[in-house]
């Protein structure tokens, strides 16, 4: 298979789509079949000790396939899309040099599209005073106040960001307050004339939205059985330092239970609803990727379909 990796541009297979669609299992099967390794494109699975609530791949699920960018960062540390594209790019270079197929797998669409499109990000030094001021305002006024400020100064970027995606809202406000530059303009300037990789993007979903929601509910129930409450309590107890995790779906839904303002059943119902809403946003993001190949769970035989797509992609001539 070495000849398949001699192109000037490395070949990369990405697997995306909403939560609870079987991306992990499919990626492991393809990695074993095509001699690949997996690069996680999940903004929460990077953290150490946060396994259940992030649906982090287990050693059993890995089946001996090496996984990169999983569980390597302390929860106190911030991690940006710039950090991801830098580390993932280095990993792709290393794997390609070894004759291995890089598979970029996860539900964080921004990570995948930024990497495959070669969007460059220049990490800026954050002024601690600006960040502290924004964090204080978040605590006092809530995420909607920060989002309203972003919509006022950079409506183009605000339209692409969910109001509850606080880390991205804060990052854009930090940039604007520190430099006067808009994140929307930074994004446009960062887009290269040519993509750095030859890529195949496979996206998994269900034709029937009800089936997807059932799978999400089942996953949430399994998380309860696997100890998500203990992880959520850990995050709650460290919410001032685990700032990213404290905003993540899977943990913040249980904070009212720890505060004595809601029962466990209602918190679990809230988690299921938040996860379904997140899946809708993931679908919206990935549907904008015009070159994505969609695979539907109802059709069955996903592994064979994905293998055929991958085989054809790898056999394409290098011109």
Each model region followed by its residue ranges:
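Phosphate/pyrophosphate-binding catalytic cores of soluble transferases and nucleic-acid-acting enzymes
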Residues: 1-319
């Amino acid at each position: 298979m070495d000849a398949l990796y001699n192109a000037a541009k490395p070949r990369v297979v990405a697997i995306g789509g909403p939560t609870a669609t079987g991306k992990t299992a499919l990626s492991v099967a393809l990695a074993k079949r095509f001699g690949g390794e997996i690069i996680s494109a999940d903004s929460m699975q990077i953290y150490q000790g946060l396994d259940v609530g992030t649906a982090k791949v287990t050693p059993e699920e890995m089946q001996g396939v090496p996984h990169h960018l999983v569980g390597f960062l302390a929860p106190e540390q911030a991690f940006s899309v710039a950090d991801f594209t830098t580390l993932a790019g280095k990993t792709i270079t290393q794997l390609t040099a070894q004759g291995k197929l890089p598979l970029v797998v996860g539900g964080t669409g921004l990570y995948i599209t930024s990497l495959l499109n070669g969007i460059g990000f220049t990490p800026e030094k954050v002024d601690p005073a600006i960040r502290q001021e924004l964090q204080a305002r978040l605590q006092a006024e809530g995420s909607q106040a920060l989002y309203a400020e972003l919509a006022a100064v950079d409506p183009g970027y605000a339209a692409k960001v969910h109001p509850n995606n606080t880390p991205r809202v804060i990052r854009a406000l930090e940039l604007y307050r520190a430099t006067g530059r808009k994140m929307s303009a930074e994004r446009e300037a960062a887009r290269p004339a040519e993509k750095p990789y030859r890529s195949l993007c496979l996206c998994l979903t269900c034709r029937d939205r009800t089936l997807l929601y059932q799978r999400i509910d089942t996953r949430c129930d399994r998380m309860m059985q696997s100890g998500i409450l203990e992880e959520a309590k850990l995050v709650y107890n460290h919410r001032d330092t685990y700032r990213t995790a404290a905003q993540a779906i899977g943990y913040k839904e249980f904070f009212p239970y720890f505060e004595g303002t809601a029962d466990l059943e209602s918190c679990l119902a809230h988690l299921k609803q938040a996860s379904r809403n997140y899946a809708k946003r993931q679908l919206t993001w990935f549907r904008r990727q015009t070159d994505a190949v969609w695979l539907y769970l109802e059709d069955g035989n996903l592994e064979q379909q994905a293998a055929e797509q991958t085989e054809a992609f790898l056999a394409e001539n290098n011109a």
